């Protein structure tokens, strides 16, 4: 499944923690998950709360690893998310959807 998770920002505190991400849902295909972000479906941006999103392909299991990840940033002109390269602030982090 392809999980959509949004993040307020990418800043880490002194202990290395980020603000808690929010998983909005999942879809059976990447294309459908990407379409949800491209159209800001159900306002996953939440009127300005979330600046970043990640789509992760996660298989079933206990503590599964992300098999694929794509990063997105909110485009204020388009009022929707646009795909972006993996941010430099993200190092060896994964599985935002399930913790």
PLM regions and their residue ranges:
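Short aromatic-glycine-(Arg/Gly/Cys) micro-motifs in beta-strand/loop hairpins
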Residues: 1-23, 49-54
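Terminal low-complexity, poorly structured segments
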Residues: 3-6, 33, 94
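Compositionally biased, low-structure terminal segments
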Residues: 4, 25-31, 51, 75, ...
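A short, charged, amphipathic alpha-helix used as a generic interaction element across diverse proteins
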Residues: 15-21, 27-50
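Short, mixed-charge low-complexity intrinsically disordered segments
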Residues: 39-99
């Amino acid at each position: 499944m392809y999980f959509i998770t949004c993040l307020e920002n990418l800043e880490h505190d002194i202990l290395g923690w980020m603000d808690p991400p929010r998983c909005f849902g999942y879809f059976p295909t990447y294309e459908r998950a990407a379409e949800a972000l491209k159209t800001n479906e159900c306002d996953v941006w939440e009127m300005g709360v979330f600046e970043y999103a990640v789509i992760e392909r996660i298989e079933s299991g206990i503590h599964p690893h992300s098999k694929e990840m794509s990063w997105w940033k909110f485009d204020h002109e388009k009022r929707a998310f646009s795909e972006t390269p993996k941010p430099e602030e993200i190092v060896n982090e994964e599985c935002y959807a399930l913790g």
